[in-house]
Amino acid sequence: QYVYPVLPYAPIHHYTVPVQVSTQYHAQDILGQFAFHHAGDNQVRTETKSFDGSVRGLYGYVDPTGKLVNVHYVADSNGFRVVGANNLPEAPSAPAVPDVKGPEPVQDTPEVVAARAAFQKSYDEAAQAAAVSPDVQVS
């Protein structure tokens, strides 16, 4: 007679898979105003529209790192704007402005000073001559 050896076995584990709960609602009136909400599959969205056409809402989801991301927004006559979010990058701080002095103004050389004086003298003489005998008769 042959005896079968007792083989080791893996214990049986029973697991329950969590069931995704999904909720939603929608309401609308004859003026075009509406409100809706949807939640499920690790995401959520809520939105309302007023009689003036402006829309306010939020959406949220779980990003690949497991972080819950929420974004609140407004869409109206000024366009779509995010008014609050926890996933926006932060700008780096501006570096300190160094205290730098500019160069000193250029000083005129003696030749430039003499040329300016000669030009001013010629200009003044021409202005006096033009005042004495104008090209157009003034009555």
From Swiss-Prot:
Matching InterPro entries, A to Z? Answer: Cuticle_Struct_Prot (IPR050468), Insect_cuticle (IPR000618)
Q: What is the protein name stated in its UniProt record?
A: Cuticle protein 6
Q: Which organism is it from?
A: Blaberus craniifer
**Chitin-binding type R&R domain residues:** 31-92
Which of the residues bear the PTM Pyrrolidone carboxylic acid?
Q1
- Which UniProt keywords are present, listed alphabetically? Cuticle, Pyrrolidone carboxylic acid
PANTHER family given for it? CUTICLE PROTEIN, CUTICULAR PROTEIN 72EA
Entry GO CC: chitin-based extracellular matrix
UniProt-listed Pfam families: Chitin_bind_4
Q: Name one GO molecular function term.
A: structural constituent of chitin-based larval cuticle
